[in-house]
Amino acid sequence: MKISTKYMTINYTEKDREYMKYLLDYLQRNEIIIVNFFKLSNFGEKVEITLHSNLDDFRKKYNEVYKRIPENWVCGFAYNNKYIETLSLSEYRKTKSHENVNIDNLCRLIIHEFIHSCHFKANSNSIYVRWLSEGLATTLSGQYDNIDNKFIFDATEEEMINGTTKYYNYYLMFK
């Protein structure tokens, strides 16, 4: 099945049908904020999002794109400025440390990946800087805004540059 917003096309399955209206409303409210943030007056092709209803298929796609096996916590990724791969809510809950995620977490995950796509579109001729891209995505998506935990920044400069730290460190750096 397929549904679209102004800037996205979402491919989903029957597994996702129960929350698609909520997801679509959320994405429509937030996509324009992100597009305006990056000043993308000429957006180009819509970003194509696939909600995978099978974790193994999602991991195969990741391996196909990045030529490596994903970590067991990976639940979404963006590539080529126009593709986003995420998991359906039930499959998202099967990844490490995501057992209790809800529809709001899925919405923020998709917006996080959409931010990457917009950042790449806005800076297509620039070198990819992980700490900047992840800092923007974790902060603008609000992924950590409603979490009660008191996070402490605990990453080295090398970990931030190489992307070998927890995502909350990128968030904390930008807050």
Q: What is each stretch, according to the model?
A:
Residues 2-117:
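Juxtacatalytic substrate-recognition/specificity segment
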Residues 24, 28-31, 134, 138, ...:
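Extracytoplasmic/secreted envelope proteins and their assembly/folding machinery
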Residues 35-39, 115-124, 141-146, 175:
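Sec-exported extracytoplasmic/periplasmic mature domains
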Residues 73-77, 135, 170:
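Glycine-centered structural positions embedded in regular secondary structure
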Residues 99-103, 107-108, 129-130, 163, ...:
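Short capping loops/turns at secondary-structure boundaries
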Residues 122-164:
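Post-HExxH zinc-binding segment in Zn-dependent metallohydrolases
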Residues 160-175:
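Pan-zinc metallopeptidase signature
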